[in-house]
Design a protein with these regions (language model features):
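Non-catalytic connector elements of ABC transporters
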Residues: 1-68
C-alpha cells in the first residue's frame, strides 16, 4: 500500500475503547503512546483489537490508523 503521508509511526494497539459512535485507540510506539479517536465503524472494518500491529499516520490536522 502506498500513501503520501510521511509521518508514519509503527506500533501496537495496547487499548481500544469502543463507544456508540467513536473508538479511542491507544498505540504503543517505542516508549511512547499515541492516542487516536476514529469512528467505531472504521475500527470494526479494520477489525482492530488489542495487540494488533498498526501504523499511526500523522497529518497536520489528524491522526489515521492503517493495519497491515
Amino acid at each position: 500500500m502506498a500513501i503520501s503521508a510521511r509521518n508514519q509511526l509503527k506500533g501496537r494497539i495496547i487499548d481500544i475503547q469502543l463507544g456508540e459512535v467513536m473508538a479511542h485507540v491507544s498505540v504503543r510506539v517505542g516508549k511512547n503512546v499515541v492516542e487516536s479517536v476514529i469512528t467505531r465503524r472504521s475500527a470494526e472494518q479494520l477489525n482492530l483489537k488489542k495487540g494488533d500491529a498498526v501504523t499511526a499516520i500523522v497529518k497536520s490536522t489528524e491522526v489515521m490508523l492503517m493495519k497491515d
